[in-house]
Amino acid sequence: MKGSQASDDATGSLGPGRLQLPAMRVLVAPDCYGDSLSAVEAAAAIATGWTRSRPGDSFIVAPQSDGGPGFVEVLGSRLGETRRLRVCGPLNTVVNAAWVFDPGSATAYLECAQACGLGLLGGPPTPETALAAHSKGVGQLIAAALRAGAARIVVGLGGSACTDGGKGMIAELGGLDAARRQLADVEVIAASDVEYPLLGPWGTARVFAPQKGADMATVAVLEGRLAAWAIELDAAAGRGVSAEPGAGAAGGIGAGLLAVGGRYQSGAAIIAEHTHFADDLADAELIVTGEGRFDEQSLHGKVVGAIAAAARPLAIPVIVLAGQVSLDKSALRSAGIMAALSIAEYAGSVRLALADAANQLMGLASQVAARLGNSGPSGYR
């Protein structure tokens, strides 16, 4: 369907429409859009739609990830060999998980969402799936990386259906003691930009389990399970790993990785390093980024917020094209973002946006490109 005219009122101003700017270098750097579009698919849709209205612009297409869905796809397009492994999914069905091995550095890049992601449930999440989902497949991926001779294993955290604290993952490696022995000489990285602990009001069950189908009673059960498991994790590690930043990432898989000798590192920073994002940023006159839901959390430990923070000192304008937007003009100004526009608003509803996500994003990008003013990038702010 033809999209509606994007609103200026709540999400920043793009100025008068259909006035031509000189050709620009546009950095297209989105995260994934939930289960609707991978970062690679979203970047292609934005660039294609933009070109329809501004064919003279040049593009730097650099899809991003913070360790969640798309982490392996983004890295696979830049380095190493993408491999496939049939593993146990979050509800015990067999899934075909992708991972990347870079033989030059003997580094394996894994992604939790490939083995226990929400998109692998086979339907909407429910309290029952929230209780049953596990991380066994992640342990199977780690075992495969060890068999391949990995000296470094980077595990992208995010988008998981489980809240098991990595218990299933560790069970697949033979338990805590066996996992620690197997990984003693391997550098293990828990890649995420989620800094929440395992337990408590800001822990993984209370913050993230409701997004995985859990109701209040289910959250309480999950919290109790995690509290018991945390005692074992902390004892194995010899320190309080369950309270450390990142322990709550991916349903607590972060805590499991920390307990077997891993360390926490920003997933967005890992992707930025391997995609040479700093060089791309230096060449850009405008940045177009986006994600599924753009809200306050996006500005704290997610790709879009990290991009805006990096662009601000360089005075590079940033436009966000998101599935849904819940930040007002004041919040955008504070973050250094010129405008944020909603695909759902453009399409007419969330349902229509989800039904044809790539084409709706393409259409919104085309509309935004056509409506830019003629004062050049410096006039956007």
From Swiss-Prot:
Keywords assigned: Kinase, Transferase
GO biological process, one term: organic acid phosphorylation
Pfam family, one: Gly_kinase
InterPro entries noted in UniProt: Glyc_kinase_flavodox-like_fold, Glycerate_kinase, Glycerate_kinase_RE-like, Glycerate_kinase_sf
A single GO molecular function term of this UniProt record: glycerate 2-kinase activity
GO cellular component, one term: peptidoglycan-based cell wall
Similarity remark: Belongs to the glycerate kinase type-1 family.
Protein name: Uncharacterized protein Rv2205c
